[in-house]
UniProtKB/Swiss-Prot annotation:
It holds the Pfam family Ham1p_like. Its EC number is 3.6.1.66. It comes from Aspergillus fumigatus (strain ATCC MYA-4609 / CBS 101355 / FGSC A1100 / Af293) (Neosartorya fumigata). ITP binds at residues 11-16, 51, 67-68, 84, 143-146, 164, 169-170. This is Inosine triphosphate pyrophosphatase. The lineage of its organism: Eukaryota, Fungi, Dikarya, Ascomycota, Pezizomycotina. Its cofactor is Mg(2+); Mn(2+).
Length: 187
């Protein structure tokens, strides 16, 4: 058994924090800090790395950051890493309307965690992907785009927390991080 490691997860999203703690809780102790880190424009990987670098500089130590993308196949991957801004501007119905003139409503959810050991260090990425389709909102509306992303017949919002934490893009990324931690890579 590895000694308990503490990770400082940079987030102000209590739902993300709860999922991370539920999935990593037996391997690592999660502290959380809400700091504003300006996000660059770029690929999900570029955004995740830069966010981790900037957070490590601000904190002065090791950090874990997370970025999520939701890409619509019909729109060649848009809104992608900018889903948060699209959702804020358009809402669930607006995101659905973007696809109304297309037959293809398939989407890919991508979660990228970036771990940075500290200022000046290169972040390490852990990424998970889940395929699904975009549907009219179903289930509770309190966690981002969960009500419109359907995987295996249920939206993320319709799934109980345990089920979502077994199939989600976030779970898949965290499983890779968890394995890395269990392998003793983090001193």
């Amino acid at each position: 058994m590895i000694p308990t490691v503490k990770l400082n997860f940079i987030t102000s999203n209590k739902n993300k924090l709860a999922e991370v703690k539920a999935i990593l809780g037996n391997v690592v102790e999660i502290d959380s800090q809400a700091i504003e880190v300006p996000e660059i424009q770029g690929s999900i990987e570029e955004i995740a790395k830069e966010k981790a670098r900037r957070a490590a500089e601000e904190i002065g130590g090791p950090v874990l950051t997370e970025d999520t993308a939701l890409g619509f196949r019909a729109l060649k991957g848009l809104p992608g890493a900018y889903i948060k801004h699209f959702l804020s501007a358009l809402g669930h119905d607006g995101l659905n309307k973007m696809l109304d003139s297309f037959e293809d409503r398939s989407a890919e959810a991508v979660c990228t965690f970036a771990f940075c050991r500290g200022p000046g260090e290169e972040p390490i990425l852990f990424q998970g992907r889940t395929e699904g389709i975009i549907v009219r909102p179903r289930g509770p509306l309190n966690f981002g785009w969960d009500p419109i992303f359907e995987h295996n017949g249920m939206t993320y919002a319709e799934m109980d927390k345990e089920e979502k934490n077994r199939v989600s893009h976030r779970y898949k990324a965290l499983a890779k991080l968890k394995q890395w931690l269990e392998d003793g890579t983090l001193p």
